[in-house]
Amino acid sequence: MDIRAEIQTRVDEIEQIIKRYLPAEEGWQKTIMEAMNYSILAGGKRLRPMLMSETYRLFGGKSKVIEPFMAAMEMIHTYSLVHDDLPAMDNDEYRRGKKTTHAVYGEAMGILAGDALLNYAFETAAKAFDMEPDNRNIGKAMQILATKAGIYGMVGGHVSYTHLRAH
């Protein structure tokens, strides 16, 4: 078995899962959807959804109910990168070899795209209820996802980093 080929196969599968959950670029919200999709499709290792999937399987998970959570996890990660790149934070112009979201769509749309990715992540994760409406673990998983992305998780960590950087 070639581990690099196996990892690339998994990354390709995850890319397809993510694409299935992205919003269609249409309607009066088209610009925000374009900015969201631009951000999340800019590449990346897809390590977080890969680890989530493998952990799910390790503990006996077999259904596709994990897939909306995999996409949601990558949306949350991407939102954090979009916001991190903003002028008020790190003011980066490039990420993964491409112009950052705010560099392409403007600062205001960069903020909105990050916000939209975070909210859309929870809309996406909630689609797991459509697959298994009686699965109580979905609610627990959503609670964990929210906590780990929020003030007691990723956002809280970024606040600490911002304070340290300011001093």
Regions found by a protein language model. Give the residues of each.
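Extended, well-ordered alpha-helical scaffold segments
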Residues: 10, 14, 137-144
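Conserved N-terminal diphosphate/IPP-binding helix and adjacent helical/loop segment
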Residues: 1-76, 82, 89-90, 95-103
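Residue-level signal for inorganic ion chemistry
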Residues: 51, 121, 157
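Conserved ATP-utilizing enzyme core subdomain
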Residues: 140-158
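Inter-helical turn/loop segments and adjacent helix faces that build the functional surface
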Residues: 124-141
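Multi-pass membrane catalytic core of lipid/isoprenoid biosynthesis enzymes
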Residues: 103-122
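Conserved small/polar residues in nucleotide/adenosyl-binding loops
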Residues: 162-167
